[in-house]
Amino acid sequence: MRMRCPVVWGRQGVGQNCEGFLKSRRPVQQLVGERPDRMEEACGVFAVLAVEQPVANLAYFGLYALQHRGQESAGIAVFNQDKVRLHKDMGLVSQVFDQEVLARMPGDLAIGHNRYSTTGSSRVCNAQPVVLMTRLGAFALAHNGNLVNAAELRQAVDDGQAEFTSTTDSELIAFAVQQAVDRGLDWPEAIRSALKLCQGAFSLVIGTSQGLFAIRDGYGIRPLVFGHL
């Protein structure tokens, strides 16, 4: 079974599909848990690319609608050209954000996250999105799902320079992307390379100064929907 690639949205709103993802060798039952007959995914991820629109506000309402999926923490990262502004904290969406905070987050691309902890403790250091720097600039990642090879992935990305600030597998995926970019790959190639190291069920959104990436695991276990504004 061939995994689906990320859907890549550039700043002109053009979609592009890619090939070549590695599927997990684990049975589907191991990816979805002991009760594959019921929905067990947690966390909410949201992303929006909209020129000349208040994307922070759009992300806020998107997270508000997804809040049933996670109520421990909330966060939004907004890109304004080559700059990224991140705000995240413990609590409900309405407790973490108000109009004053949102007004300080101009831009045309935003990703957001509601957290329900499945790996890592319920602390602010584990709130998302995760933001890291690369040679191509900053990127932000929001993740729903679980990796069944998190221990192996941590060993793979622990190159002696990675400064881990959380206990989540989401940060491990982000470091895998960062290191792939810093090896000389562009964003789509780096994401493909990083996901070859990941086994599990997941949906991801990744924001960069060059575009928005939406990724779903090859089995389609974790929900992810996209559309046009």
Model-derived features: where do they sit?
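Conserved short alpha-helical segments that host acidic/polar catalytic motifs at enzyme active sites
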Residues: 22-229
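Methionine residue identity
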Residues: 1-3
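Low-complexity, intrinsically disordered or signal/transmembrane-proximal segments
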Residues: 12, 16, 29-30
